[in-house]
């Protein structure tokens, strides 16, 4: 059986035991519950019977005293009979009660005492029956509790002990099977593959694991033997390849040295030719640069002359605009002065309005006082006087606002006047400087025109010299090309040799790496005991 099946078996047995205990306890509780329900029903019937007996006793007494009808007594007795069918102790007395009630109906009142004694006897029997039922119920509950307690304290421990023993046996066997695996793991950690594991004959997971582990160790041992054999063979081949590669490298080094000597001599010849060519090219280049510079200088001189003339025209326009700005600034000063005068006049008007408002306020106050003295006749005049006083106060407040605004405008006008004066001064100064600059630009234009004529003469002479230098440079360039072709051919051969040498060195490096890896592999394989 597999480990999973064994574990499932233990769980099933334990669960079955628990279910058995639960079913047993449930049946006991079910039986006890039925008894309790039956006792409770009997108790309810007894209580109902006692109530009916009490009511019957009361109705009989009322009937004897002509306070109740015979139908009520009969109806109540019939209800009591229905209850008595379910209570044996009450049913025994129903015939006697029925005879006594019949006699009372026929007019025999002395029977009432017998009915009362019968009812009391029935009540005593019912109460005695209830006591017996309660005692039986207590015994039933005690028995059920004792039975369940015995089951819980006897059956469950037995099941738990049995399950524990079974699990202990199963785990012990599993650990015994795993012991060779642990020993083999320690041997593998010590690089020892000579360990021999006995084959397990079980069919559970632990036995399967042990057999798979045994097969893995044997597979690893066989592979390591093959690796050892192949490693020694590869090491011998690497040594032979390394020796052959060293011989090729030495031959390539000798050829490379001879090619370096040839290349050095050709490079020396080429360098001399190149120096001569470079000198003539430098002369030609310098001559061309001088000619170009002279032509550029002449062109710049023409441009400078044109720009100077344009600058003179622009400067004249600036002078005219500056003078116009100066005139406008003076006009602004006049406007600002007129504005300040108008502000002073507005201030005077505001003060006059303010004085009138104060006088109006005083007159309105006096009118209000006189209206108050006049009583009812002056009430309307007092209202008008109060409105006039408010209007005077609003006028006074508005005049104050106007004065404040006028003061702000006057301050701004003063600032504008100062700025305008400063602009006028700066414009006059700029006009003087512009006049001086105009005179100097005229002088510069004349000087640049003279320089332009001299540069044109220099450019013509340099062009003739440049043509002669170009002829010398052409001849030297052809010699330099021939030397370069020879040098390039030698360099190409040398480059090919260098590539071959580099490839050989790379092969040597890789062979050395392989040699080191093989040596490391030999050391690793040698650690294992096979």
Swiss-Prot record:
SUPFAM superfamilies per record: Methyl-accepting chemotaxis protein (MCP) signaling domain (SSF58104)
Its membrane topology: Multi-pass membrane protein
Cell compartments where the protein resides: Cell membrane
Domain Methyl-accepting transducer span(s) in chain numbering: 244-480
GO cellular component entries: plasma membrane
Cited PANTHER family: METHYL-ACCEPTING CHEMOTAXIS PROTEIN 3, PROTEIN ICFG
Protein name: Methyl-accepting chemotaxis protein 2
Originating species: Thermotoga maritima (strain ATCC 43589 / DSM 3109 / JCM 10099 / NBRC 100826 / MSB8)
Lineage: Bacteria, Thermotogati, Thermotogota, Thermotogae, Thermotogales
């Amino acid at each position: 059986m597999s480990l999973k099946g064994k574990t499932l078996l233990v769980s099933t047995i334990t669960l079955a035991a628990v279910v058995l205990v639960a079913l047993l306890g449930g049946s006991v509780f079910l039986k006890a519950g039925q008894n309790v329900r039956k006792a409770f029903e009997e108790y309810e019937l007894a209580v109902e019977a006692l109530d009916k007996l009490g009511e019957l006793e009361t109705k009989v007494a009322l009937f004897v005293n002509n306070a109740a009808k015979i139908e009520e007594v009969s109806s109540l007795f019939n209800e009591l009979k229905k209850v008595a069918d379910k209570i044996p102790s009450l049913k025994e007395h129903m015939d006697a009660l029925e005879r006594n009630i019949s006699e009372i109906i026929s007019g025999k009142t002395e029977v009432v005492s017998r009915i009362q004694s019968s009812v009391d006897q029935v009540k005593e029997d019912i109460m005695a029956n209830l006591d017996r039922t309660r005692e039986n119920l207590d015994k039933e509950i005690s028995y059920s509790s004792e039975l369940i307690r015995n089951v819980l304290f006897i059956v469950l421990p037995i099941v738990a002990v049995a399950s524990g023993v079974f699990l202990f046996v199963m785990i012990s066997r599993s650990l015994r099977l795993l012991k060779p695996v642990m020993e083999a793991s320690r041997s593998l950690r010590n690089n020892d593959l000579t360990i021999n594991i006995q084959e397990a004959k079980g069919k559970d997971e632990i036995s399967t694991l042990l057999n798979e582990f045994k097969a893995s160790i044997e597979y690893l041992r066989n592979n390591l033997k093959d690796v050892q054999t192949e490693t020694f063979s590869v090491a011998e081949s690497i040594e032979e390849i390394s020796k052959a590669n060293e011989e090729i490298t030495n031959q390539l080094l000798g050829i490379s040295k001879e090619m370096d000597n040839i290349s050095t001599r050709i490079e020396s010849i080429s360098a001399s030719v190149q120096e001569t060519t470079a000198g003539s090219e430098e002369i030609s280049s310098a001559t061309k640069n001088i000619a170009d510079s002279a032509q550029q200088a002449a062109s710049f001189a023409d441009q400078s002359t044109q720009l100077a003339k344009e600058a003179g025209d622009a400067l004249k326009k600036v002078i005219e605009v500056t003078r116009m700005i100066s005139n406008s600034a003076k006009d602004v000063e006049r406007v600002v002065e007129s504005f300040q005068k108008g502000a002073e006049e507005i201030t005077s008007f505001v003060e006059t309005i303010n004085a009138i408002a104060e006088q109006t306020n005083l007159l309105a106050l006096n009118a209000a006082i006189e209206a108050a003295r006049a009583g009812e006749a002056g009430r309307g005049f007092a209202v008008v006087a109060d409105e006039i006083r408010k209007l005077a106060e609003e006028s006074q407040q508005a005049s104050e606002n106007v004065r404040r605004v006028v003061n702000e405008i006057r301050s701004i006008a003063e600032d504008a006047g100062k700025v305008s004066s400063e602009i006028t001064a700066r414009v006059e100064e700029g006009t003087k400087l512009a006049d001086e600059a105009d005179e100097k630009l005229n002088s510069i234009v004349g000087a640049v025109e003279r320089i332009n004529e001299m540069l044109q003469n220099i450019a013509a002479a340099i062009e003739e010299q440049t043509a002669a230098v170009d002829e010398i440079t052409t001849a030297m360039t052809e010699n330099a090309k021939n030397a370069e072709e020879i040098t390039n051919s030698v360099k190409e051969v040398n480059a090919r040799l260098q590539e071959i040498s580099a490839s050989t060195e790379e092969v040597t490096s890789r062979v050395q790496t392989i040699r080191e890896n093989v040596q490391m592999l030999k050391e690793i394989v040698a650690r294992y005991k096979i």
